């Protein structure tokens, strides 16, 4: 099994990179996010590798970090998720953001991935929610806040602040995290306009 490759970027394809390692070209399939972060052709690169062996082929999947590779494996434990869908999810969400999305039940963020509809996004959240914190630390306050928003029990100023940030174009995950941070500074009785202002300050960092 191949666990890591270090070589020179030979060329790129739509969903893969060919890595030249001592004269041998390895075709490595990657998420769009990973491909975007690799260097230009001719420069050195290294990737953590997941090797899939079948009767008729050997396929390599490459990742910029061990965390991304672990999520690739974990995603495939859910029915309906294969390698293509797993790479699609990792193309739109960083490992830390994916952990937050699952822990907070943000199905909309996950459903943005190609090949993932609302039903599969809900299944991913349901089956992986208890496992997500083990892969990346998620603020317990953020989880509680997300649960309150989902159940419509959050204070109105909180819900209004999150909605306002989302309407400004921020993803639900980032908006919720920013308001959670704002709440810690402003206190539970803060007005929506205060939470929005402090939330925007958090997002600008």
From Swiss-Prot:
Its main location: cytoplasm. It comes from the Bacteria. Belongs to the RuvA family. GO terms for biological process: DNA recombination; DNA repair. Homotetramer. Forms an RuvA(8)-RuvB(12)-Holliday junction (HJ) complex. HJ DNA is sandwiched between 2 RuvA tetramers; dsDNA enters through RuvA and exits via RuvB. An RuvB hexamer assembles on each DNA strand where it exits the tetramer. Each RuvB hexamer is contacted by two RuvA subunits (via domain III) on 2 adjacent RuvB subunits; this complex drives branch migration. In the full resolvosome a probable DNA-RuvA(4)-RuvB(12)-RuvC(2) complex forms which resolves the HJ. Disulfide bonds: none annotated. It holds the Pfam family RuvA_C. GO terms for cellular component: cytoplasm; Holliday junction helicase complex; Holliday junction resolvase complex. Residues 65-143 are annotated as: Domain II. The RuvA-RuvB-RuvC complex processes Holliday junction (HJ) DNA during genetic recombination and DNA repair, while the RuvA-RuvB complex plays an important role in the rescue of blocked DNA replication forks via replication fork reversal (RFR). RuvA specifically binds to HJ cruciform DNA, conferring on it an open structure. The RuvB hexamer acts as an ATP-dependent pump, pulling dsDNA into and through the RuvAB complex. HJ branch migration allows RuvC to scan DNA until it finds its consensus sequence, where it cleaves and resolves the cruciform DNA. This is Holliday junction branch migration complex subunit RuvA. The lineage of its organism: Bacteria, Pseudomonadati, Pseudomonadota, Alphaproteobacteria, Hyphomicrobiales. Keywords: Cytoplasm, DNA damage, DNA recombination, DNA repair, DNA-binding.
